[in-house]
Protein backbone atom coordinates (compact mmCIF):
# COMPACT_ATOMS: atom_id res chain seq x y z
CA UNK A 1 0.00 0.00 0.00
CA UNK A 2 1.30 3.46 -0.84
CA UNK A 3 1.56 6.44 1.50
CA UNK A 4 -1.61 7.82 3.11
CA UNK A 5 -3.66 10.04 0.83
CA UNK A 6 -4.09 13.54 2.37
CA UNK A 7 -7.73 13.53 1.22
CA UNK A 8 -10.41 11.62 3.14
CA UNK A 9 -11.68 9.17 0.55
CA UNK A 10 -13.28 6.84 3.13
CA UNK A 11 -15.65 8.90 5.29
CA UNK A 12 -17.73 6.73 7.60
CA UNK A 13 -17.65 3.99 4.97
CA UNK A 14 -19.79 0.94 5.60
CA UNK A 15 -20.54 1.92 9.21
CA UNK A 16 -24.18 2.92 9.60
CA UNK A 17 -24.63 6.51 10.79
CA UNK A 18 -27.06 6.78 13.72
CA UNK A 19 -28.45 10.27 13.24
CA UNK A 20 -31.57 11.27 15.13
CA UNK A 21 -33.32 14.37 13.83
CA UNK A 22 -35.88 16.33 15.90
CA UNK A 23 -39.42 14.88 15.80
CA UNK A 24 -37.98 11.67 14.29
CA UNK A 25 -37.69 13.41 10.92
CA UNK A 26 -36.07 11.30 8.23
CA UNK A 27 -34.42 14.15 6.40
CA UNK A 28 -33.17 17.66 7.13
CA UNK A 29 -33.26 20.31 4.41
CA UNK A 30 -31.43 23.61 4.48
CA UNK A 31 -32.22 26.22 1.87
CA UNK A 32 -29.47 28.66 0.97
CA UNK A 33 -29.88 31.73 -1.21
CA UNK A 34 -26.63 33.07 -2.66
CA UNK A 35 -26.66 36.86 -2.94
CA UNK A 36 -23.76 37.81 -5.25
CA UNK A 37 -25.21 40.36 -7.67
CA UNK A 38 -22.97 43.37 -8.18
CA UNK A 39 -19.81 41.78 -6.74
CA UNK A 40 -18.93 39.58 -9.73
CA UNK A 41 -16.12 40.34 -12.19
CA UNK A 42 -17.14 43.51 -13.99
CA UNK A 43 -15.17 46.44 -15.38
CA UNK A 44 -17.42 48.72 -13.30
CA UNK A 45 -15.86 47.06 -10.22
CA UNK A 46 -12.35 47.76 -11.53
CA UNK A 47 -11.84 44.31 -13.05
CA UNK A 48 -10.10 43.67 -16.37
CA UNK A 49 -12.86 41.40 -17.68
CA UNK A 50 -16.52 40.58 -17.32
CA UNK A 51 -17.70 37.53 -15.36
CA UNK A 52 -17.99 34.19 -17.18
CA UNK A 53 -18.56 31.66 -14.39
CA UNK A 54 -21.97 30.01 -13.81
CA UNK A 55 -23.66 31.94 -16.57
CA UNK A 56 -26.66 31.12 -18.70
CA UNK A 57 -24.53 32.20 -21.67
CA UNK A 58 -23.08 28.91 -22.93
CA UNK A 59 -19.35 29.21 -23.60
CA UNK A 60 -19.15 32.77 -22.25
CA UNK A 61 -15.75 34.35 -22.78
CA UNK A 62 -14.25 37.22 -20.78
CA UNK A 63 -14.73 40.56 -22.47
CA UNK A 64 -12.31 43.40 -21.79
CA UNK A 65 -15.08 45.91 -21.41
CA UNK A 66 -18.68 45.90 -20.34
CA UNK A 67 -20.59 42.71 -21.13
CA UNK A 68 -24.14 44.07 -21.08
CA UNK A 69 -25.81 40.66 -21.39
CA UNK A 70 -23.77 39.25 -18.49
CA UNK A 71 -24.46 42.31 -16.37
CA UNK A 72 -28.17 41.95 -17.09
CA UNK A 73 -28.14 38.31 -15.93
CA UNK A 74 -26.66 39.33 -12.59
CA UNK A 75 -28.90 42.38 -12.23
CA UNK A 76 -31.96 40.15 -12.63
CA UNK A 77 -31.11 38.47 -9.34
CA UNK A 78 -31.14 41.70 -7.36
CA UNK A 79 -34.04 43.32 -9.24
CA UNK A 80 -36.44 40.36 -9.42
CA UNK A 81 -35.01 36.96 -8.48
CA UNK A 82 -34.36 37.75 -4.82
CA UNK A 83 -37.81 39.26 -4.36
CA UNK A 84 -39.66 36.34 -5.96
CA UNK A 85 -37.88 33.83 -3.76
CA UNK A 86 -38.17 36.02 -0.66
CA UNK A 87 -41.95 36.30 -1.10
CA UNK A 88 -42.23 32.53 -1.52
CA UNK A 89 -40.14 31.82 1.59
CA UNK A 90 -42.17 34.33 3.61
CA UNK A 91 -45.54 32.96 2.42
CA UNK A 92 -44.50 29.39 3.29
CA UNK A 93 -42.70 30.48 6.49
CA UNK A 94 -39.50 28.78 5.34
CA UNK A 95 -36.36 29.81 7.23
CA UNK A 96 -33.31 30.18 5.00
CA UNK A 97 -29.66 31.07 5.12
CA UNK A 98 -28.36 33.82 2.84
CA UNK A 99 -24.78 33.51 1.63
CA UNK A 100 -24.24 37.25 1.22
CA UNK A 101 -21.31 38.81 -0.62
CA UNK A 102 -20.32 42.01 1.20
CA UNK A 103 -19.99 44.28 -1.85
CA UNK A 104 -23.30 43.02 -3.28
CA UNK A 105 -25.15 43.59 0.00
CA UNK A 106 -23.78 47.14 0.28
CA UNK A 107 -25.23 47.92 -3.16
CA UNK A 108 -28.81 47.00 -2.21
CA UNK A 109 -30.00 48.29 1.19
CA UNK A 110 -33.61 47.29 0.39
CA UNK A 111 -32.60 43.63 0.08
CA UNK A 112 -30.65 43.92 3.35
CA UNK A 113 -33.70 45.36 5.12
CA UNK A 114 -35.85 42.49 3.83
CA UNK A 115 -33.25 39.97 5.07
CA UNK A 116 -33.24 41.63 8.51
CA UNK A 117 -37.05 41.79 8.73
CA UNK A 118 -37.33 38.12 7.71
CA UNK A 119 -34.73 37.19 10.34
CA UNK A 120 -32.77 35.09 7.85
CA UNK A 121 -29.41 33.77 8.93
CA UNK A 122 -26.69 35.46 6.88
CA UNK A 123 -23.32 33.80 6.38
CA UNK A 124 -20.55 35.79 4.76
CA UNK A 125 -19.89 34.83 1.16
CA UNK A 126 -16.78 37.02 1.03
CA UNK A 127 -16.23 40.55 -0.17
CA UNK A 128 -16.27 39.80 -3.91
CA UNK A 129 -17.75 36.94 -5.92
CA UNK A 130 -14.55 36.14 -7.76
CA UNK A 131 -12.22 33.17 -8.11
CA UNK A 132 -9.63 33.40 -5.31
CA UNK A 133 -7.48 30.54 -6.68
CA UNK A 134 -4.69 32.88 -7.82
CA UNK A 135 -5.29 35.83 -5.49
CA UNK A 136 -2.43 36.63 -3.09
CA UNK A 137 -3.05 35.59 0.50
CA UNK A 138 -2.70 39.19 1.71
CA UNK A 139 -5.38 40.35 -0.75
CA UNK A 140 -7.72 37.50 0.18
CA UNK A 141 -7.24 38.34 3.88
CA UNK A 142 -8.04 42.00 3.14
CA UNK A 143 -11.22 40.92 1.32
CA UNK A 144 -12.21 38.74 4.29
CA UNK A 145 -11.84 41.71 6.64
CA UNK A 146 -13.89 43.93 4.30
CA UNK A 147 -16.62 41.26 4.14
CA UNK A 148 -16.77 40.95 7.93
CA UNK A 149 -16.88 44.75 8.31
CA UNK A 150 -19.70 45.09 5.77
CA UNK A 151 -21.69 42.29 7.41
CA UNK A 152 -21.23 43.81 10.88
CA UNK A 153 -22.23 47.29 9.67
CA UNK A 154 -25.34 46.03 7.85
CA UNK A 155 -26.60 43.36 10.24
CA UNK A 156 -25.23 44.56 13.58
CA UNK A 157 -23.08 41.50 14.25
CA UNK A 158 -20.24 39.64 12.61
CA UNK A 159 -21.17 36.58 10.51
CA UNK A 160 -21.25 33.15 12.18
CA UNK A 161 -20.68 31.27 8.95
CA UNK A 162 -18.28 31.61 6.03
CA UNK A 163 -18.54 30.48 2.40
CA UNK A 164 -16.09 31.70 -0.24
CA UNK A 165 -17.29 29.36 -2.97
CA UNK A 166 -14.36 29.81 -5.32
CA UNK A 167 -11.68 29.45 -2.67
CA UNK A 168 -7.90 29.38 -2.81
CA UNK A 169 -5.36 27.09 -1.18
CA UNK A 170 -5.21 29.77 1.58
CA UNK A 171 -8.93 30.17 2.27
CA UNK A 172 -9.30 27.56 5.01
CA UNK A 173 -6.18 28.83 6.82
CA UNK A 174 -7.55 32.39 6.71
CA UNK A 175 -10.92 31.25 8.10
CA UNK A 176 -9.12 29.44 10.93
CA UNK A 177 -6.77 32.38 11.59
CA UNK A 178 -9.76 34.71 11.91
CA UNK A 179 -11.24 32.32 14.45
CA UNK A 180 -14.62 34.00 14.69
CA UNK A 181 -16.74 31.59 12.65
CA UNK A 182 -18.89 28.72 13.89
CA UNK A 183 -18.82 27.00 10.51
CA UNK A 184 -17.09 27.01 7.13
CA UNK A 185 -19.28 25.90 4.22
CA UNK A 186 -16.28 25.46 1.93
CA UNK A 187 -15.24 22.39 3.93
How would you label these PLM feature ranges?
Residues 2-187:
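Catalytic alpha-helical scaffold of carbohydrate-active enzymes acting on polysaccharides/glycoconjugates
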